[in-house]
Amino acid sequence: MRVLSIIPARGGSKGINLKNLVILNQKPLLYYTVMASLESKIINKTVVSTDNKKIGKTALELGAEVVYRPKKLATDTAQLEPVVDHVLAHLEEYQDYNPEIIVILQNTSPLRTAKHIDEALTLMKKKKYDSILSGFSIHTFLWKQFKNSIKPSDYDPKRRPIRQKSGEQLFENGAIFATKTKCFIKSRCRISGKIGFYVMPLEKSYNIDSQKDLKAIRKFLKN
């Protein structure tokens, strides 16, 4: 089966300058996602989509393929789906390659490993999902903010259960998205159809979007 991973890695970033190449534990941030993809036993093609030559050079050195995207697909407001479209069109035109499964791996999740990826894809196949995403689960109570107060979303405070028996809440962590290519083409969305959820440990769900996040994960890795 042809399983393609697409790693979006644009040069611009509001929170951290050239974030995808920032050094984390003596390695560029890009390293962790590229290596997780290359070490996967299921993914058989790894492509980094970028507009930046330094990022492209680093990706090639790490062993990934590179597809350079136009600047209009590398702005702060650019959506991910057109980037996926661009990669698919490029691979079809220049390599006559059409994947059956698309896996989207974001560099902001450096603690996601090849094991996580393979477990998610195995679950997707086993349960016959059209798409799957990763996240973490917590047994907790949710509240909604209204104009002048808050109200519980999923329980009655007068009959409050113990936390362990509260509803399991699922939170997306952005580390893994996978979908059948035919579903992506039909829906124009990274996840669609029958969607599955792969649970990752909370401590592996770090997401780097700011200097504060970067400091936190450096501290975590040091310990």
What are these regions (language model features)?
Residues 22-23, 48, 104, 206:
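Conserved SAM-binding loop
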Residues 43, 97-99, 128-129:
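Short, high-confidence coil segments that cap the C-terminus of an alpha-helix
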Residues 53-103, 112-115, 119-122:
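Short phosphate-binding loop-to-helix
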Residues 29-45, 57-58:
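A short, N-terminal amphipathic alpha-helix
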Residues 82, 107-201:
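Conserved core of the sugar-phosphate nucleotidyltransferase
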Residues 1-17:
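N-terminal nucleotide-binding beta1-loop-alpha1 segment
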Residues 42-47, 203-205:
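Short active-site oxyanion
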Residues 186-206, 211-223:
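Catalytic donor-sugar/metal-binding loop of nucleotide-sugar-dependent glycosyltransferases
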